């Protein structure tokens, strides 16, 4: 019992810590919202100031650019003359360099050919020398073997040997000589093979050298073709410059026409306006990127808060477990009291046990009554044993049912916790997916955002959802029609997954939350009378057993009611929130 109480205390502490963490997270979220609004206002002020400063600087820049252009035109004439002289000198240097490179390439190719020929001659001489040495070694070995054979024959001639052995020796010598001739032929064939292999290698080297020369000639041809193309392009550029000079000579602006000066002034004013609009567009685009990053950070915080809420223990489950624990404790205490009472009664019966009577005549007279009482007592004992067996069977069935119900509750609670964790993981993955889309395909994301206006669904109660609907319908009537028509046209090609956002807990932890009470597990105690065992002679143990049976029936009925209510409350009506952000909506989300 003490261990269970300690576990309950630890679980309560964990629940309190989780609630405190959620409260702190909510407070931090509100603080972050306030800081966000302050930063947004500051950024707006700084943006306006910077846009004004940038416009002034752009105007100064434009005037300075005009002055610089005049000076650049003065310098361009000098640079053009300098470039002409430099290009002529470069062209001459390139021609000389190409001639020298060609001469050097021809000389290098000749030297390479000579080196290759000398290498091939050297390899052939080395191979011939090697073959001759090998032949010399073989002939020396054959000479030594022949001398040894002659010496052996001379020694054997002196000895007495039969004619058959001599014939066999002669045949052996003939076979050895034939084998030696075959080996010589084989070696000559190997020498020829090596010579052919050497010739093949030399031919391959010549082929590689020829292919290299061919590639060099092709590169030279390509370089010549490129030089020809560059010359053509230079000729075209010169023709274009000549045409431009002729047009400038015929330009009426040079003659002082006032109409073209007015057009030039209007063009300059429009160019200034275009520059200012570009600067404003750049600043607004940067602000949009900052707000998008802030939205991603907020989504990550919401995902972490959802994960914390998933890790939090269910208060209804804890209350249910505590209630069952208290019932079991009461049952154990009642059983202990009954056991003590039975022990006291047993001791009292032993103390007050009647002594055997002394008179035998009185026993003989009262035998009839004692036999009758004994028969009644035996019948009552048999009935009591039968009832005990029935009660024990009923108790075992009730315990098995309660154990099965507890196991199902544990599994259901585990699946709910896993579902919450999966929701938080899904939220994080969606945020990461959006970040990757923005990182790798920002243009497509911007087009999708312009084409479609999404509505995020927040699972809030029906009363709050009705109030939110009344506030948002007035703001989003025209936009929703257009966006719905566009979405119906483009939904089959580009399906968009809508993220589910769960509202955070409020700052006040003591007040009961109606949303949590709806979503959490509820236990309803049925008021119907429990099923009772028919009347019979009861003992204190039987009374306790009947109570246990009643409690098991009641727990099973509570479990069925709880399941039906859970099935009813699975569906939760979503509320549509407009895409325009307001302070009230953001506070409600937090």
Swiss-Prot record:
The keyword Repeat does not apply. One of its GO terms (molecular function) is kinetochore binding. Residues 446-590 are annotated as: Disordered. It is found in: Chromosome, Centromere, Kinetochore. Residues 541-554, 572-590 have a biased composition (Polar residues). Residues 483-497, 518-527 have a biased composition (Basic and acidic residues). PANTHER family: BICD FAMILY-LIKE CARGO ADAPTER (PTHR32123), PROTEIN SPINDLY (PTHR32123:SF9). This is Protein Spindly. It comes from Danio rerio.
């Amino acid at each position: 019992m003490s261990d269970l109480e300690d576990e309950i205390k630890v679980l309560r502490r964990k629940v309190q810590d989780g609630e405190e963490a959620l409260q702190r997270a909510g407070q931090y979220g509100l603080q972050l919202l306030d800081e966000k609004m302050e930063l947004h206002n500051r950024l707006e002020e700084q943006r306006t100031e910077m846009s004004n400063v940038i416009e002034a600087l752009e105007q100064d820049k434009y005037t300075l650019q005009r002055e610089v252009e005049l000076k650049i035109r003065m310098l361009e004439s000098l640079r053009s003359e300098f470039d002409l002289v430099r290009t002529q000198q470069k062209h001459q240097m390139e021609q000389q360099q190409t001639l020298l490179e060609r001469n050097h390439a021809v000389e290098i190719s000749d030297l390479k050919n000579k080196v290759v020929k000398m290498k091939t001659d050297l390899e052939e001489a080395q191979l011939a020398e090697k073959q001759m040495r090998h032949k010399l070694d073989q002939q020396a070995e054959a000479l030594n073997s022949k001398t040894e054979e002659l010496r052996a024959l001379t020694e054997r001639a002196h000895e007495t040997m039969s004619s058959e052995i001599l014939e066999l020796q002669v045949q052996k010598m003939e076979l050895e000589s034939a084998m030696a001739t075959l080996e010589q032929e084989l070696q000559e064939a190997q020498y020829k093979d090596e010579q052919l292999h050497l010739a093949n290698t030399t031919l391959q080297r010549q082929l590689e050298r020829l292919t290299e020369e061919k590639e060099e000639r092709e590169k030279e041809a390509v370089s010549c073709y490129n030089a020809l193309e560059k010359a053509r392009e230079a000729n075209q550029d010169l023709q274009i410059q000549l045409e431009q000079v002729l047009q400038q000579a015929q330009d009426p602006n040079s003659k002082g026409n006032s109409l073209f000066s007015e057009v030039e002034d209007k063009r300059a004013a429009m160019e200034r306006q275009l520059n200012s609009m570009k600067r404003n567009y750049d600043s607004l685009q940067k602000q949009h990127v900052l707000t998008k990053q802030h939205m991603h950070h907020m989504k990550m915080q919401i995902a972490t808060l959802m994960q914390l809420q998933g890790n939090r223990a269910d208060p209804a489950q804890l209350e249910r477990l505590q209630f069952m624990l208290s019932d079991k404790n009461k049952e154990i205490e009642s059983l202990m009291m009954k056991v003590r009472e039975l022990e006291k009664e047993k001791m009292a019966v032993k103390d007050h046990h009647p002594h055997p009577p002394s008179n035998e005549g009185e026993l003989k007279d009262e035998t009839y009554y004692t036999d009758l009482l004994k028969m009644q007592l035996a019948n009552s004992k048999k009935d009591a044993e039968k009832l005990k067996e029935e009660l024990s069977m009923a108790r075992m069935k009730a315990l098995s049912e309660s154990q099965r119900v507890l196991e199902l509750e544990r599994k259901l609670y585990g699946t709910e916790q896993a579902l919450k964790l999966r929701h938080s993981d899904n939220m994080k993955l969606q945020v990461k997916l959006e970040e990757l889309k923005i990182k790798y395909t920002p243009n497509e994301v911007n087009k999708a955002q312009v084409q479609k206006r999404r509505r995020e669904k927040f699972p809030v109660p029906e009363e709050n959802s009705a109030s939110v609907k009344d506030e948002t319908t007035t703001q989003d009537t025209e936009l929703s029609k257009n966006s719905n028509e566009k979405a119906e046209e483009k939904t089959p090609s580009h399906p968009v997954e809508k993220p589910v956002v769960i509202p955070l807990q409020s700052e006040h932890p003591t007040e009961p939350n109606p949303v949590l009470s709806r979503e959490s597990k509820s236990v309803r105690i049925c008021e119907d009378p429990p099923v009772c065992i028919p009347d019979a002679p009861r003992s204190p143990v039987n009374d306790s057993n009947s109570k246990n049976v009643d409690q098991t029936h009641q727990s099973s009925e509570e479990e069925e009611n709880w399941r039906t209510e859970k099935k009813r409350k699975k569906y939760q009506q979503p509320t549509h929130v407009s895409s325009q952000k307001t302070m009230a909506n953001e506070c409600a989300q937090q």
